């Protein structure tokens, strides 16, 4: 038996499709539209109802938990909070101010104190991790490699507990991801007419717990790169969630984009 804490993005849906009917599980559905509500093993609760969540785990005699998908940082003044939530809420709010990585670490620690072990988010889906190498026909040139170096350098300088998992480097200019996500980052850059240049680097946050919240990319990410006039996408060895692999590589080859894993 495993407890699945599911948030937004297609990653939880992929896990669900793979394990349904094969594994014993239950779902804590934190999606806005309650995507998993039709599953009889799904529970809809508030992030602040920690006591209820822990009670469900104990009722199911479940000792393992898997986090997948994005959970939007809640408005703490409006969420439902139970007694155990009240006990933990001040620590959660304090850590949330340090960034997503610190908040997730605190939540993992809370479950650990309740003797519930957090497993890697790719426990059921190791095929979504990519190893080092180039996955498309197109390869980065000398200028692309300079852009890659600059983007990685900028990410390494970022605070260990912040939300930054992505950077776009183009012509010695860096655009960093904010807590609004990758899509918002793309809105900040303009396509240079008839010229392809620049790269998107998606790495985990510095010193984050790699069991949760790995950067998720896929076909939509590559389409955003193409629309922005970028040359390619750079990922970290076995530290990303890569969805739509076959379609993504086909799209990259068709549009002369590189997919590099370092």
What are these regions (language model features)?
Residues 6-11, 70-74, 172, 240-241:
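Gly/Ser/Thr-rich loops at beta-strand to alpha-helix junctions
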Residues 4-6, 27-28, 65-68, 118-123, ...:
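General beta-strand structural signal in soluble alpha/beta enzymes
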Residues 11, 97-101, 107, 114-226, ...:
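Conserved mixed alpha/beta catalytic, RNA-binding, or beta-rich assembly cores of soluble enzyme
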Residues 31-37, 42-55, 59-62, 80-92, ...:
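Feature captures the catalytic cores and cofactor-binding loops of soluble hydro-lyases/lyases
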Residues 21, 36, 75, 129, ...:
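Short secondary-structure boundary/hinge segments and terminal tails
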Residues 53-124:
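N-terminal glycine-rich phosphate/adenylate-binding segment common to multiple enzyme folds
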Residues 1, 21-24, 61-63, 114-116, ...:
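Short coil/turn connectors at secondary-structure junctions
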Residues 1-30:
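N-terminal basic/disordered segments at the start of proteins
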């Amino acid at each position: 038996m495993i407890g699945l804490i599911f948030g937004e993005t297609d990653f939880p849906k992929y896990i669900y499709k793979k394990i349904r009917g094969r594994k014993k599980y239950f779902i804590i559905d934190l999606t806005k539209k309650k995507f998993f509500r039709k599953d009889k093993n799904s529970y809809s609760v508030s992030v602040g109802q920690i006591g209820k969540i822990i009670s469900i785990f104990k009722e199911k005699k479940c000792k393992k938990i898997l986090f997948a998908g994005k959970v939007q940082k809640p408005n703490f003044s409006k969420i439902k909070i139970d007694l155990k939530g009240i006990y933990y809420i001040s620590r959660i709010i304090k850590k949330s101010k340090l960034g997503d990585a610190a908040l997730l670490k605190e939540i993992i620690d809370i479950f650990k104190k309740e003797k519930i072990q957090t497993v890697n988010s790719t426990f059921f889906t190791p095929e979504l991790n990519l190893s080092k190498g180039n996955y498309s026909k197109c390869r980065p040139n000398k200028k692309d490699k300079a852009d890659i170096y600059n983007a990685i350098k900028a990410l390494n300088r970022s605070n260990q507990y912040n939300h930054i998992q992505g950077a776009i480097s183009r012509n010695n200019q860096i655009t960093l991801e904010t807590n609004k996500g990758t899509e918002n980052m793309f809105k900040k850059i303009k396509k240079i007419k008839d010229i392809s240049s620049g790269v998107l680097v998606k790495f985990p946050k510095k010193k984050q717990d790699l069991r949760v919240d790995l950067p998720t990319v896929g076909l939509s990410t590559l389409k955003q790169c193409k629309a922005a006039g970028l040359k390619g996408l750079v990922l970290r060895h076995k530290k990303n969630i890569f969805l739509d692999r076959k379609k993504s590589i086909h799209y990259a080859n068709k549009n002369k984009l590189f997919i590099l894993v370092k």
